[in-house]
């Protein structure tokens, strides 16, 4: 790996982020190409069209697209791979980009201003995009195996998971909790746009503090399924992991299943050009946020000590990322 690879990869990563953000990938739909005439059919202003045309032009230079003489823009194998993995670019560039540029400027490692450098909505969106591409089928199949009625999503982000679950399971209702005000604002918009106001509600709170909210206790007691994707490591850095798990059990006393997914420390010691996507980015940002990332074996020990029975462990098709079904 050379410096040129890293530099060009950084520029390409930003390009990929904007291809998704500005809706260029969306123009392909489920196809591998689209006709450029579609840009005139869309309700874009001149500035938007110029931005999209420039993004397409640079995407051909980076080898993401092919601009053919017949007016079609086609995805290359690299472009298809970028689109499939776009969630990781939304997560890193959109969610943590500002943090990764500025974290060394923070004087106090306990200063909450570091969280102001993180775009929680983009972190949630990127996680959801990656979830849909790699993990969602496994999670839905697991939910279908269970008899679910009232589900709570800890760290719900923009409520994408809850919305999808309620679309699949007609009689299910959901509650989402997230500490990010941006993510909750996005969730409220998504819930409204999907006509789910009567089935899903969201709360802007720290999960551990929500457990003491008297206005939520009655709702918590109706929950039969708890889900949480890529957030346990945050909770485990607030309090002792076993205490956190026991608190969740007490908070949701009638929950029959806990579906908890997280990413663990990589076993690799050196990054190479063959290293898989995401893992090192995950470890990098959390290290400089002073958030410890654990090993899978440690989670198994925490669950056991908290009194959970591990019913199933499933790999989620993202490096070092697993789903635990607990009861």
Task: Name every feature range the model reports, one short phrase each.
Residues 180:
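Conserved SAM/SAH-binding beta-strand->alpha-helix loop
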Residues 158-170:
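Conserved SAM-binding loop of SAM-dependent methyltransferases across substrates and taxa
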Residues 1-98:
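N-terminal accessory segments
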Residues 187-188:
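Conserved SAM-binding loop
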Residues 261-306, 311-313:
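C-terminal alpha-helical "lid/dimerization" subdomain adjacent to the S-adenosyl-L-methionine
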Residues 147-157:
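Conserved class I S-adenosyl-L-methionine
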Residues 234-247:
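A short, conserved alpha-helix within the catalytic core of class I
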